[in-house]
Amino acid sequence: MNSTPRTVLAVITACALLASLSAQPAPSTISHWQRASETPIVSPQGEAWESAGTFNPAVALFHGKFVMLYRAQDRAGTSRLGYAESTDGIHFQRTLAPALSPLTPYERGGGIEDPRLVQFGDTYYLTYTAYNKKDAQLCLASSRDLVHWQRLGVILPAYKGKWNVGWTKSGAIVPEKIGGKYWMYFLGTSADKTDQMGLAYSTDLVHWTEALDTPVLPVRPGKFDARVAEPGPAPILTNDGIVLIYNGADDKLVYRTGYAIFDRKDPRHLIARSSDPIFAPEKDWEKTGQVPNVVFVEGAVPQGDRYLFYYGGADKYVGVAQAEVSGATASTAPHK
């Protein structure tokens, strides 16, 4: 009875090792990474829906404004999405009420977590994790103004994957069609209990099919991503390929930032991967919070020859960093 799980685990482990060995070290596509603010730009406040944590944000440009959707958590552990605006990308003004609160059976209890944004035409698509205290599942919503949202439901159900046998989370959608399909990197849990990155495709953004029988970006023993390899914001399209910022956790669950480059004509093909992290928790507010020692990038906005990268610090605060991205093309992030 126990031979099948061991066989599956052996196959997944072998495929992961082969994928890691075949990828080359990443070129200097991303350089001069540094904090754009030494202190948090959004912090918990009040006694209600955002009292325990404000973290893991998605950000888009809309009519000249920076619009942030961030995960807000109350002291009971329920998450909602807060809304904030800025003219400079650093100083944000928040609304009094959340933008999205748990309503559906698959959201009630734990709530709505970890947003990521991508734009196609005049429509913004929001991937988020719905958690009902039992299952975490990847969901989708759409909007034309980033204020009024239409839920489109669960797009990758938990426990029904190929290699991923648990929850589904963290959908980072490539911001252009490739081969007539939409492509999305996501987080799944493999048979060995590690959280690894998968890939799915769709023709309508609502119905998704896994593209591979194994993780597209596996964890690497002994590295900064030994336990977790989780997508960050929507990938950036560059001359080098599809650049995906991702969040890696080591065996001590310290979260750091890396990046991977996939073939622009074939999102399944990993070209290169950073050997070492490009960003790590250093500030006190990145080391101490609801979860210690975490920097977790989820938002990216182009600004001239650089990008602003928005991240969660210790599952409690929002921070912002900046870096240069060489060879980035025009349609690389949500904008209008």
What are these regions (language model features)?
Residues 9-20:
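Bacterial N-terminal signal peptides
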Residues 21-110, 118-227, 236-293, 304-336:
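Beta-rich carbohydrate-recognition and catalytic domains
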Residues 1-11:
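Bacterial N-terminal signal peptides that target proteins for export
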